[in-house]
Amino acid sequence: MTIRSVVLGCGSYLPQRVVTNAELASRIETSDEWIVQRTGIRERHVAADGEFTSHLAINAARAALANADVDPQSIDLIVLGTSTPDNTFPATAVAVQNGLGIHHGAAFDLQAVCSGFVYALATADNFLRSGSFKRALVIGAETFSRILDWNDRTTCVLFGDGAGALVLDAQQQGGTAADRGVLSTHLRSDGRHKAKLYVDGGPSSTQTVGHLRMEGREVFKHAVGMITDVIVDAFEATGLSAETIDWFVPHQANKRIIDASAHKLHIAPEKVVLTVDRHGNTSAASIPLALDVAVKDGRIKKGDVVLLEAMGGGFTWGSALVRW
């Protein structure tokens, strides 16, 4: 027998305000056609004044707990993937824990930029499989609108705010790819590329928050190869393949990257879950947001094999295979 981290439920939250490409085109030199052609993005959500990353995360966590039909007091681990915490410290996860009325167990943030949710999922999975904890909330939440240079049309059109969450439960399974739960996780990073996607501020370096800076062509050039390599690792570890997975839920950064990755891996287009058009790139929140959409609309069902992947600044990247 093997302990697996089984998904009990999922949830998400999006800020009320929607910013369309047309609105951006009225403020900066861009157009709906230019944005859609290069990214596939049509609109994104932006947090209101006074609405913090913790608020988004708490709402997503509550939705996931309700979907799982579990008592918040049964949660003994919260791992929050975010690059936009409320404060330098304490961890935003602690604010989430308190907001949910949980005063036991452990809660901490994990920062791997757009790979943050996959990193958080892998971390929680390892804690559950080790027996250290029994039930976890894994959250991705971001307010990237707060770190954008709204005069830089190459970056400000790409990102949005939001949060998504999963409830994981440690359960005894048979130890095969037929098990429900997290079947594999693979994480990678290479700091040689850190200057290609970064924020030009920080408490130690500039004592300011800073703005996101990106060499878009360089990111695109590396993304497809890195993503596909770490997915091949997942397939080899589990004996699964592009043919045997049911759904591919990638980080929603750019439709061209998603399409190219699916094509290289021979994943059928109808298996790809796309939400980048309506959410934009929500960094660590993008995968759980997309998962929640596909669960709510009936595509992802119990027993389905779901492939997750992400790549973010650092570079960091990773994959996970989950049987729902």
From Swiss-Prot:
Record keyword Cytoplasm present: yes
Domain of life: Bacteria
Gene Ontology annotations for the cellular component aspect, listed alphabetically: cytoplasm
Pathway: Lipid metabolism; fatty acid biosynthesis
One GO term of the biological process aspect: fatty acid biosynthetic process
Enzyme class: transferase
Main subcellular location of this protein, as a coarse class: cytoplasm
Record carries keyword Acyltransferase: yes
A GO MF term: 3-oxoacyl-[acyl-carrier-protein] synthase activity
EC assignment: 2.3.1.180
Active site per the UniProt annotation: 114, 251, 281
Region (ACP-binding): 252-256
Pfam families recorded: ACP_syn_III, ACP_syn_III_C
Physiological role: Catalyzes the condensation reaction of fatty acid synthesis by the addition to an acyl acceptor of two carbons from malonyl-ACP. Catalyzes the first condensation reaction which initiates fatty acid synthesis and may therefore play a role in governing the total rate of fatty acid production. Possesses both acetoacetyl-ACP synthase and acetyl transacylase activities. Its substrate specificity determines the biosynthesis of branched-chain and/or straight-chain of fatty acids.
Subunit: Homodimer.
Family, per entry: Belongs to the thiolase-like superfamily. FabH family.
Domain remark in the UniProt entry: The last Arg residue of the ACP-binding site is essential for the weak association between ACP/AcpP and FabH.
HAMAP family assigned: FabH (MF_01815)
Protein name: Beta-ketoacyl-[acyl-carrier-protein] synthase III
Organism: Bradyrhizobium sp. (strain ORS 278)
